[in-house]
Amino acid sequence: YAYQYAAFILYSAYILAKRTFKKRYDLVYVHNMPDVLVMSGLFPKLVGAKVILDQHDPMPELMRTIYNLDEHSMSVRIICWLEKWSLARANLVLTVNKACERLFSERGCPIEKIGVVMNSPDEKIFSYREARPSLSSSKSGDPNKHFVVMYHGSLVERNGLDLAVEALARVRETIPNVELRVFGRSTPYLEQVLQRAKELGIEKHVRYLGSRQLEDLVPEIDACDVGVIPNQRNAFTDINTPTRIFEYLASGKPAIAPRTPGILDYFDAQSLFFFEAGDVAELATRIVDVYSDSSRAFEVAQRGQKMYVAHAWQQEKQTLLKLVSGLLQ
């Protein structure tokens, strides 16, 4: 990573500097990772260009989570210093939610220099559809109808698919026809989770259906009863607002998500089903809640959709355009 990052930063800095002599840039838009890629825009900035640093993922928190690093370790301290240096070089810092805005502000970036543009689903793919009441297998009169819990996304430990499998084992007696459908690119972690499902005797209740294009996920979401975001608690998931929540809500499906700052900034218990991050028992309880009370699940999904509408990409796009326009004026 270090070699690739360094090579790309130097090459991009050279290209931008060379082109600046021919035609000056008004704006250089830098998207992390790494944060220090902002270095490539320094020469254009010297001759008048504005530099935006788009911080989608705070690197210290992400590296701590991926590599299980202590926050006081030398590696994390270096990454924090590089982040602070990079934030200072930008004219405008963009980030994805209020939690990251607070984080960067606490690390010395002036709050007035930070803009929030949320990660919103593409409305051309995840178009808004009003929530509709659904019936569980016990209430529909069809004993063959599965109660479908859906997970889609990266199959890595921090996203907690193992918690969903453990929760499924707990709810099987209450929901005999429960089925967990999993979508995402196969990883060694997934193999561990599927092996655990066998050990728990629920392998027939867990279906891994492979990776899907975004367009192909929509009918799968339509076919589920509830979407689950079973994140483990860690430095990164604490500040993350998963786009998957909005993807479920766009289709009118209730979602179960961890009670973390990055999510609580936007949702409450009236618009999402919450569990304590890492708590299998509470996650299982929330799955049963959705199954047992379809009327409440419908109402919660309806209220959650209001937040989806408020932060749909058409709204967020206008926020981005206003921030850029204000910077260039």
Identify the residue ranges that each predicted region occupies.
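Conserved acidic donor-binding segment of nucleotide-sugar-dependent glycosyltransferases
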Residues: 269-280, 289-294
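Nucleotide-activated donor-binding/catalytic signature segment of Leloir-type glycosyltransferases, i.e.
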Residues: 191-216
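Membrane-proximal helix-turn-helix segments that form the acceptor-binding/catalytic region
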Residues: 13-17, 36-47, 53, 59, ...
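Carbohydrate-associated surface elements
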Residues: 99, 120
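Conserved donor-binding/catalytic core segment of Leloir-type glycosyltransferases
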Residues: 142-168, 181
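A short, well-ordered alpha-helix in the C-terminal region of glycosyltransferases
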Residues: 282, 289, 296-310
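Acidic donor-binding loop of glycosyltransferase active sites
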Residues: 91, 221-238, 253
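Glycosyltransferase donor-sugar binding loop
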Residues: 152, 179-194
